Amino acid sequence: MSDKTNEKTVVLDTPILRGNTEIKEVVLRKPQSGALRGTRLQAIMDMDVSAMMTVIPRISTPTLTAQEMAELDPADLTAMSVEVVTFLLKKSVLADLPTA
């Protein structure tokens, strides 16, 4: 998945501490259908916190733990959630979106 639309890097406002390591950014890859199991597509599109806390660890590098997800800065969770939703949009929809 070298295509830029299949992978996004999110720079964290509040780094995650894992032992002596600071995680300052998380790479999210476009989920395959299996990574969405146990969630509802509508919940993901609504950026439901529970749905995102299920899906994001499955598609993140490094893989985030449940505890790390629970302690995320809400701004960082929102930034990652936006990227997850963007992955689910068709290319034709993305082409029609305004760019910054």
Locations of the language-model features?
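Short, surface-exposed, charged amphipathic helix/loop patches that serve as local interaction elements
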Residues: 2-100
